[in-house]
């Protein structure tokens, strides 16, 4: 299939590995609608505060590669892959502001995609910061 799986974890430099892949012209796919650990960034998502990972937005900011939000939505004929408009993370006076604005754009994109059928979206991890 041509898929390379990169497993992250403590002691591994996953960010640099992914950065190198992007710079060399490879596409990467990252789970971006939830932070699987508690180090995410708070962002408004469906009128609640959720924890999103900063990594995808930080990679885009560092490499200049756009983010293309996607979602798999179940239809009567099977699953359909939907692409939202690609976007570049905006440059602001500091990285934290750029990351926050990029995450807001990402969360808005996911809201539009998931609103096609919110019943298809699920998580077994806490998403909303109020759940922590």
Predicted segments, located by residue:
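Membrane-interfacial amphipathic helices and adjacent loop/beta segments
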Residues: 1-11
């Amino acid at each position: 299939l041509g898929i390379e799986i990169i497993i992250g974890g403590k002691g591994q430099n996953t960010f640099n590995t992914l950065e190198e892949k992007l710079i060399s012209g490879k596409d990467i796919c990252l789970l971006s609608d939830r932070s699987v650990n508690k180090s995410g960034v708070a962002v408004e998502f469906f009128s609640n505060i959720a924890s999103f990972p900063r990594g995808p937005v930080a990679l885009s900011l560092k490499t200049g590669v756009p983010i293309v939000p996607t979602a798999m939505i179940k239809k009567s004929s099977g699953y359909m892959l939907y692409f939202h408009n690609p976007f570049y993370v905006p440059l602001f006076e500091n990285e934290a502001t750029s990351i926050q604005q990029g995450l807001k754009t990402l969360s808005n994109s996911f809201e539009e995609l998931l609103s096609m059928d919110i019943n298809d979206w699920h998580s077994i991890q806490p998403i909303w910061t109020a759940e922590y």
